[in-house]
Every structure is written in C-alpha cells, then in structure tokens.
C-alpha cells in the first residue's frame, strides 16, 4: 500500500494530542476531590481545548516563562520556532500562592465541571504593559485584547495539560472537525493544496470574491469561522453558521469546500494574530492562508495591510504555510462586479467598499444589506435574526 502523506507537516513537526486516555481519565477522576482547583474563564477553556486537539501544536500546555518571554519580545518559542501569541493561564496571587510546582491542578470550567488537569511546572509574574505594547501594539484599555489582559491575574501557571474528554460541541457537533480529522478529510478528498480562511463575520461579497480567487489556484477551501469568545457586538455564532451554510449551498462548489468551526477565542491582536491564525490552520492541514485587509484587527489600531507586512519578517520555511495576500475588494459599479484596484479601472466614487463592520452597522440600524454587500439569501437570514422586516 502506498503511503499518502499529509499535504503539510504540523508546526514543529508533530501533531500534539493532549486528550487523556480512558485510563488516564479514570486516574485523574479518582484524584478529583484531592486536587487544588483553578476555575477557567471561557477563553482559557477554549485554549485548553485547542492545545489538547493539536491546533496549537507544538504547545503541550500553558507557556513557561522562557517561551512566554521570547514570544512577547521576538515572536518565537524558546527553541526558536515561530510563535506570535502568548498562550498562558493567568491567576491572582491569592490563587497561585498555595499551588505547589510539580503538583497536579484540577481545571474547572465556569460551571464548576472538572474538564482538565495541569501539571504545574512553573509559577511566574509578568509585565502586562510590556505584553500589551508588544503583542497588541497599544496599551489602550479600550482595545478588547488589552482590556482582557489588564483584567486578568498577575501570575502565570505553566505546564502540560490533559483534557479529560473531548465533548461534542453543544451547538455545532457536525462541524467540529479537529486537526487530525481535517488532515484525513483533505487526504480523502485528494487535496494537495488547501487554503484556510479565518472569519468572525458573516461572509460578505468581498470575502466571497477573495475566497474564489484563491480557489482558482488551490484544490480546496477550508472555511474556518471562529466560534470561541468574541466581542459583544460581533454577530452570534449560530447566525453566522446559518449564513455560511446558505452561502455554500447556493454559491460555492460543495466538493471544493469544507466548513468547520474554530473553537478558539479571538484576541484582536491584528498582525500578530494573523501569523497565529496561519500557524493554527497549518496544524489543521492547510498549505495556504488568506490574509485580507486589517486581519484580526479592531478599530483603528492597525494599518490596513500591517497583517500582510508582518509575514515578510519571516523566511517562508519558518512559517511553513503560504500567505495569500489580497487587497481590499469592493463592488465596482462601472463593471458591475467585485474587483480590487488591481483589476478595476473605476474611479473612487464608483467603488462600494464592504466590511463586516458596515454590515453589522446596517443591521443595527434596521437596514437590509444591499446585494452589492451580501447575497440576498444571506441578507434575509441576517434580517430574520435581527428581526428586520424583509421586503417581499
């Protein structure tokens, strides 16, 4: 039998699996009442999940001080491997004080359920302002990522984790495809080149345009919307998923697209998060990754194409995934189609610029996005969710 290799190796060379075996799980559960407890917020829960399924490979747990410091200052792990976002577990001094390095810690979710174990190897303090300036390029507390950073505890707990059990996603079990499964799926489809697309918004016409431009070049599209923690004004995940389903059914070749959920939390770290998103999609088996305008940005904290420029700071082999950089797409009223400044002869007044923010603003005003912004079926679904009257 011929060996059918993955299209791309995971980051660091090996896909991490930190889901406890049945035997490990039984052992941990038998100790549950005797272990010190740390309660996780929703973001930490999603981080545990992403580590356990290998999406954050090569991480096997929460970062040591050496990995953390180098990630913050150089976008690398202690071993030199590219990594741009700190993955840490923060607690207060009060919580950290009695915890013994070398011991096991029970990790509970917000409902008090025992979901994971941490082998505590290190406790360390860190400089929040340094992290804010380096990772988010600002220490403005209005920035949602900085706001989370400044509200969390002052001590990091480091060490390997074990997720007790992989539970089906409560809302989208059909679309819960872990990295090991997505890699197998791509092999089964015979895809050698796969482009990943990260989104936290319903797909508007500009997104559709750049996805299809990419799909002209590669074998398959991995549409990977984020369903972890986002900002309060982001559109709810269940609404977005219905929009993706409708869009794929009507406007995409279904044999060339895979839709799956990304259970990670959004950091809004702009350029650094673009690198992070690319590395995560590499772990899912993608060979290419779409980077559009202001990727993972928020407000006016980052330049339009800063998230593209940051890829130039690394040698291609260091990342191991190819960024596909697209200019800001718009609807051209002269040619009656989607375009960018590379392909359209139009004047500025003939260009309708689209964004998820504009779509959200229109919906909040009770307005239906026009066909130049969103496909009619998607606009109707958004309107229903926002209780906007849809004209017959």
Curated annotation (Swiss-Prot):
Coiled coil, from the record: none
Q: Where are the transmembrane segments?
A: none
InterPro entries from the xrefs?
ATP-Sase_PUA-like_dom (IPR025980), PUA-like_sf (IPR015947), Rossmann-like_a/b/a_fold (IPR014729), SO4_adenylyltransferase_pro (IPR020792), Sulfurylase_cat_dom (IPR024951), Sulphate_adenylyltransferase (IPR002650)
Q: Which GO terms describe its molecular function?
A: ATP binding; sulfate adenylyltransferase (ATP) activity
* Keywords (A to Z) from UniProt: ATP-binding, Nucleotide-binding, Nucleotidyltransferase, Transferase
Query: Which pathway does the database say it acts in?
Result: Sulfur metabolism; hydrogen sulfide biosynthesis; sulfite from sulfate: step 1/3
The UniProt record lists the EC number as: 2.7.7.4
Q: What class of enzyme is it?
A: transferase
Q: Which SUPFAM superfamilies match?
A: Nucleotidylyl transferase (SSF52374), PUA domain-like (SSF88697)
PANTHER family from the UniProt entry = PTHR43509, SULFATE ADENYLYLTRANSFERASE (PTHR43509:SF1)
The name of this protein is Sulfate adenylyltransferase
